[in-house]
Amino acid sequence: MSKLLLPIFAVAGTLAAQQVVAPTPETGGSARGDGWGDYNITQSFETGYRFHLVGGDTGEYRSDANYGNGLRLLGGSFAIHSKDGHGKWFDEITLNTSGLGNDPYQSAILHVEKNGLYRYDMSWRLSDYFNPGLAVAGGEHLADTSRRIQDHDLTLLPRSHMRFHLGYSRNTEDGPALSTAQEFNLSGSAYPIFTNVRRQWNEYRMGAEAHFAGFQFTVERRWDFFKDDTPATSDGIVAAGTSSDLTVLQQFNRSQPVHGSSPGWLGNLHTRRKRWGLNARLTYVSGRNDFALDESALGVDQFGSPANRQIVVGGDASRPDLAGDLSLSYFPTDRLTFVNNTSISNNRIDGDSTYSEFLTGSNLGTTIYFRYLGIRTITNSTDVNYRLADWIGFYGGYHYSDRRVETVEGFTLPAFANSTENDVYQVGNQLQSGLAGVRLRPWKAFTVNFDGEIGRTNNPLTTISDKNFQTLGGRAQYRARKVQLSASYRESYDFQPAFSLFSSHSRGYNANASWAPRDWFSLDASYNRQHLDSSSFLAFFAGATRSTLQAKYRSIYVSNVHAANLGVRFAIRRRADLYLGYSITKDTGDGRATVAPAGTTDPIQALLDSVQTFPLTYQSPLARLSIRISPKVRWNAGYQYYGYGETFGLLSYYQNFHAHTGYTSVLWSF
């Protein structure tokens, strides 16, 4: 399955290569700063105004870009340095910020250091997330939340042989969201409910690092705490709105807190010698999780009679996790390297839960559930790298993994004697793979790599797990002072046994070019092509009058993604800098022009066809101009266009939009 995700991540990496229009990467010159006692202070601030104009689906725009109007501190930097490196309380303070004020994506990085005594690093990020959810649940699922992430790390005696570490991290998410609840039975309608998202994660760290006799030993103690206290309520009285369903939801409340903790240990031993190296790591986490749910609903059922429903759920679980890695490296000669790595992991989850339900005065009883999941994995890999000559080298390896999964499922009905039932399932598999490659360097600036891998699994755990797979790939790169060129290709096949009827195939092409013939001109371009197709057997219940088993359909998903980036930079008489860029991502799908192929009369097949390919186009040209007013002041202006279009739309709902965004700012350095 991981091989299927590789093309998606590769395309995401290509899109990330495009520059954003603001803040400007240009600087205001080399500021000398101002003296303050034994310190020198330098500052740089870019303040400006953003604007945007959106047409089409504004919800999709907010989900993808989300830039609005208003004043911004687009970027800022502040630094204090000791003149002689021996300040009283600190020797260095640096602060860098981006998007503070009203941008949906904001960040700040702070560094404080006193040479040889302490080092403090802090990072803070804020991201406003909006998900309109209009393509599912009739538009009744959406989220408008903010996530704040911060990390703090303090190192005492950072340059000594014995160092001490303290750390703290925090991740919070809050904001309104909309969901649905089904009432008052399994055949009832779904009604909108409002939630107030409140999620929080905290981690505390302390540890030490020792250097002795060429070894580095690290030990760290961690405490992780997570809680989700998101309530849900209805907003007034909501009716089903159909003549055949008289259900009315008059009142709804749900409380579902989840609290967990994960204290753990981390130990690491590392050394690198002339002929050998060692890296050993051991981690243990003792996790525990407690949850409860109290839900009540009041109204009228589908037949017009008064109805009320109350559900109470509670439980707890333990999650111990042990993992160890040992990597040994051997360098008998300068041209030969052996690396062997052994990893062991043991994950377990077990706990009890209870479910009780009362429906319109009737006690439907209590059910007690027990679940246990244990996964033990052992992996070993040996890799050899041999450089036969300066221009040619070979590498190969053998990888082996053994996994065992055990599941216990049990339940009890306290109201009935001898109702306890336990089912135990055990399954395991072994994966063996071999890889080989050659590295060529016919001349100093040019390198070529070819590699391939073949893998076999005796017992895939799921229908989409790797069975018999093979990959082939190559990469060529040319690097000179003024030009850099690279191209790569990778192909992956995964064949399953005949009874699973699943297969997948992916191909990836990539090319990059960078050219800087003059100091005042540079060009960067990239192209990425990813093809993915997967085929699987489907079995489900559906029918116009009554549901029956449908076993004649297949899921065939086809994606053909083309992504390209182009950026050109001009420096005009050392007075101005102009950047022009263009980015496009286009998925052509399987090439069809309509949602369902011509002649499709089966309504189920037509529905499946509509979601088995998703052709779309996303493009974003931009232009940015930065003019130097004085050695310390620059005026900046930029424009960026976003265009998103779906050929079919998901379930006939189109989320197309186009947006014009831009900014103007002043950068001041001193």
Residue ranges of predicted features:
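Sec-dependent signal peptide recognition
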Residues: 2-8
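Initiator methionine at the very start of the polypeptide chain
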Residues: 1-2, 17-18
